[in-house]
C-alpha cells in the first residue's frame, strides 16, 4: 500500500502498530500498578516512528478520559561513542514530554550488567584478563578491537547492546522491551543470524514473546517495511527531530573488509524488499510460525544468553560435548569453562591477542 497522504499514512502505519500493542490495552492493565515498557531509541526512522505512534496512542487515551494510560514508556538511547548526543535526545524529550528518558554509552555495560566482566574474560581467554586500572571505555575498546573481522565486531556489538538494554529494562522494573525493528530489519537480521551460525536463536530474535533473558520482547513495527516507514516519517514526524535513515558502508566493493554480513544482507533485503515486498515478508512470517523450545533451561550461552541446542547443531563447549560434524576446534587451545552456542563459538575464532591489534 502506498502512503500517499498524511492522513492515510498515519492511519495505515499507526493502526498496524497499535494492533500489535493490543496485549497492553487499558482493559488488560494490572490494577495495583502502572505498567512500564522500555523503548530503545537509536534516532533512526524505525524507533523514532515507533515512539511517535505510541505517543499519539497514549495522548488519545489521556484525552478520552480513561483515567490513566495503559502503560508508561521509558526511552533509552545507547551511545556508541564516548561523546553522547544529549542535545538530540533533548529534542525528542521536548517533542514527546509524556515519557522518561535515559542516555548511556555502550561501555556502561560494565556498570549495569554485573556479569559481563567475567563473561568477557572467560570468552576472550587468558589474554583478556580484566585490568581495573583502565576505564570502562578502554576495556571495551580492547575487547572490540581484538575481533579481527567486521562481522565479528558487529556480532559482538549486537550482543552487548542487547545485554545492556535488558539490564537497564530490569533496573527500571519494565514489563517488556519495545524494539523498533521493521519487517525489513527483522528479515535481514534473521538471514544474517543464519549465515553466522545463529539460526537456532532466530525465533527469539524475531518473534514476540518471552525472551531467554526473562523479559518480554515485542516488535510492534514488524508489519511495516522500511520504505513505508521512511514515507511515514517524512509526513508525520516533527521536522525538528531531523530523523534520517542510517547510512551503511557502500556495497559497491563486496570485498570491502569493513563490510559485515549484517551490512551485506541489510542492503540486499532493503533493495529487494522494495521490488518484492511479499517475498521478504514471508521470511518473517515463516519464522514467526516456528515454535522455539522453552527458554527456561540451565543450558544457555554465557555470552548471548540464548538456549544451547544439544541436538547436535551447537557445541556446548568448544571441542567438547558437541557431537555434530559442525563442532568447532579452536587451534589456539583456549578452553572455556562456560557454555557457548555455535554462533558465539564461531565468532570466538576471530579473536586475536590484544598485543596483535593495531590501533
From Swiss-Prot:
SUPFAM superfamilies, per database record: Adenine nucleotide alpha hydrolases-like
Pathway(s) of this molecule: tRNA modification; 5-methoxycarbonylmethyl-2-thiouridine-tRNA biosynthesis
Record localization: Cytoplasm
Residue ranges of coiled coil: none
GO CC field: cytosol
GO process annotations (BP): protein urmylation; tRNA thio-modification; tRNA wobble position uridine thiolation; tRNA wobble uridine modification
GO molecular function: nucleotidyltransferase activity; sulfurtransferase activity; tRNA binding
Keyword tRNA processing: yes
Main localization of the protein described in the UniProt heading: cytoplasm
InterPro entries xrefs: CTU2, Rossmann-like_a/b/a_fold
Key words of the record: Cytoplasm, tRNA processing
PANTHER family in UniProt: CYTOPLASMIC TRNA 2-THIOLATION PROTEIN 2 (PTHR20882:SF14)
Similarity remark: Belongs to the CTU2/NCS2 family.
Record's function text: Plays a central role in 2-thiolation of mcm(5)S(2)U at tRNA wobble positions of tRNA(Lys), tRNA(Glu) and tRNA(Gln). May act by forming a heterodimer with NCS6 that ligates sulfur from thiocarboxylated URM1 onto the uridine of tRNAs at wobble position. Prior mcm(5) tRNA modification by the elongator complex is required for 2-thiolation. May also be involved in protein urmylation.
Name assigned to this protein: Cytoplasmic tRNA 2-thiolation protein 2
Protein species of origin: Ajellomyces capsulatus (strain NAm1 / WU24)
Gene name in the database record: NCS2
